[in-house]
Amino acid sequence: MKLLVIIDMQNDFIDGSLGSDAAKAIVPNVVKKIEEADKNTLIIFTQDTHFSDYDDTLEGKLLPVYHCRYNTEGWMIHSDISEAWVDNPTNVIHDPEFIYGNTVIKTTFGSTHLMNFLIREGHNFDEIEFCGLCTDICVVSNVLMARAALPDMPITVDSSCCAGTTPEAHNATLTVMRSCQINVI
């Protein structure tokens, strides 16, 4: 079975407070990837999630941009992506780490809940693929955590379904991931 992890495809990262043209451009690619998933693919989403104390966190001090506040429009998974999954629901997770069905919320760049799931359930997968936003922050954090949790697992990142904070940061991060034996396509 394949695991497809879609990182932080949320409104604030696409066309909201931290949105970009590059992020908007990958939405159709991610939708297509979801639509093409079959019954042998488990799709998991992550959602960057912040609360009223964001300004007091290290991230809030270093990135003082209001984004992905819990239960706001900017926090929601982009509608094209959530609708694609509703139209093609692959497998549904019943796991306490996943608060909202196949979605895990996270308050940091990398998700320890996702890694706990991989440590427990990784033996059920033949491969893991990652895509989403932002390549140079949350995607790379989760990919390298997965590499540490499952050192012998084939892991792929689809670069056509990722966007970074800048094109240069995106490309540099893809190079780093290749160095860590991640298959970048």
Q: Where are the regions a protein language model picked out?
A:
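Conserved N-terminal glycine/acidic-rich loop preference
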Residues: T103-S141, A163-I185
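Acidic/histidine-rich helix-loop elements
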Residues: I14-A22
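Short internal beta-strands
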Residues: I44-Q47, P154-C161
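Active-site alpha/beta core segments
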Residues: P28-E127
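Short, glycine/acidic-enriched loop or turn micro-motifs at the edges of active sites
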Residues: Q10-N11, F51
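A short helix->loop->beta-strand "cap" motif at the edges of active sites that frequently abuts
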Residues: K39-T41, L150-P154
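Histidine-anchored nucleotide/phosphate-binding helix
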Residues: V31-E36, V140-L150
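Extreme N-terminal starter segment of soluble prokaryotic enzymes
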Residues: M1-L4
